[in-house]
Amino acid sequence: MKGLIEERIRRYEMRNFNYHENLEVPILSGCCMVMKDEAVTHCGMFDERFFLYLEDVDLSRRIHQKYRTVHFAGSSIVHQYQKSSYRKLSSLKLHLTSAIKYFNKWGWVFDRERKEMNRKVKISNHAKRVL
């Protein structure tokens, strides 16, 4: 069972991609986002219902519905990756609250749109490597 869960997480996080090359991705980390004014105008800013955690996932997903979202391999970011929601109960509560809001908004187990986004990105990135 543990192996099955780990495999689903690996696929969900797209860990098998080569992040040393530019890739179109459906979800971007909020620690560094650059976007066109046009995208913000059409898609809006961060959803204020998410106080912490998953606000970047929600925003980049909305942008990806209408625009390309790209991970640029040449960029470098230093992030104090602490996973506080794994260490502090108060942070875990915030994380779980945001996760519930996110899944209520986008779907829980069967998120067909996310599955389709991932499929298209896989095809697009594979085609770039073949060419």
Question: Which residues does each PLM region occupy?
Answer:
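Aromatic-residue hotspot detector
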Residues: 12, 50-51, 102
